[in-house]
Amino acid sequence: MGRFKNNKKSRVIGKPIAKKNQEDVSHVTGDKIPKSFVFSRMKLAGPVKQLQMDLRKLMLPYTALSLKEKKRNTLRDFLNVSGPMGVTHFLMLSKTASSLSLRVARTPQGPTLTFKIHQYSLASDIAQSQLRPRCPQDLFKSPPLIVLSGFGSQELHLKLATIMFQNIFPAIDINTVKLSTCQRLVLLNYNKDTKLIDFRHYSIRLQPVGVSRRIRKFVQNHQVPDLRNLQDVSDFVTKAGYGSESEGDEEAATVTLSSDLGRVNKGATKSAVKLQEIGPRMTMQLVKVEEGLCTGGIIFSEYDVDGKKEKLKKKQDEEEEEDSEEEGEEGSEEDGEDMDEDFED
């Protein structure tokens, strides 16, 4: 007896990305706010699965944090759902026996950039390595800022990578942006010698210059400090400066605020900008660029064997042509000498 076929179409289930109080159009560019799906079309192991969740958290608030993917889901299923939900980018993790890769694609027609992940660290690994990890939930109410370093090359694949990363997060207007929304930073640094990209995710915090950690904690928490071991209240204010986690405030890392930010940082005063890594962290390499959505012509390939063979063959042909030209010149000189001898005879 044959098995009955299930004719029901497979669907991708996920919570809506945009809430009612969220804007769908950027007031800076006038275009749709970029939104993303982070998923995999295969079953991932424990650490790689957690890396996928860390990437989803990084892309908040304009992503589907609880996206449900099933084994039978195809890329077409995700594409069909992305249209009504306003999704503009796909981030797809894939794992083989020898490598881990991340594809970043623009919907619905591409292009697609494939990165080979050489090393990665989870957000939990970063937190465990820090003395005082800092990752409050309020950080993820606003999208991160994006900073690209070393991508000034004129090569086409690096230009495409620059445009892709710049458009994956909402644009900001430095004249109208609220300081309270600048809570996170994504940094991508390209090394032209190794062709590797260092991917880092930081939280941004401001500290008033010249104020000790004890005073900052007291103002922020509004809790009565423990003064049992002190002779006088002034000892609490004057004792020991910055604490183990901080260094002196460098002039280059200080800014003057235009408005109040929180309980401690007041407008028209100097504050020190502090970055603290929250993860995930990746070291990756751009290995392929495709014209379409995971398909189409290959614009760039780091492992383009056929292209390298063609270049090598072309170089060999040019060398052979040069050799033949030199031989021709030598032959003409010998013929000239023979003709002179004939005239003398």
Curated annotation (Swiss-Prot):
Q: Where is the composition biased (Acidic residues)?
A: 318-345
Coiled-coil spans are 307-329
Disulfide-bond pairs as recorded: none
Q: Name one Pfam family in it.
A: Brix
One annotated GO molecular function is: rRNA binding
Query: What keywords would UniProt list here?
Result: Coiled coil
What is an annotated GO biological process for this record, any one? rRNA processing
The record's listing under InterPro entries reads: Brix, PPAN-like
| Ranges for domain Brix | 34-295
Q: Which PROSITE patterns match?
A: BRIX (PS50833)
Region feature (Disordered): 308-345
Its annotated function is as follows: May play a role in cell growth, differentiation and cell cycle progression.
Tell me the PANTHER family matching this sequence: PETER PAN-RELATED, SUPPRESSOR OF SWI4 1 HOMOLOG
Q: Which family does it belong to?
A: Belongs to the PPAN family.
Which named protein is this?
A: Peter Pan-like protein
Q: Which species? A: Arabidopsis thaliana
Gene from which this protein is expressed: PPAN
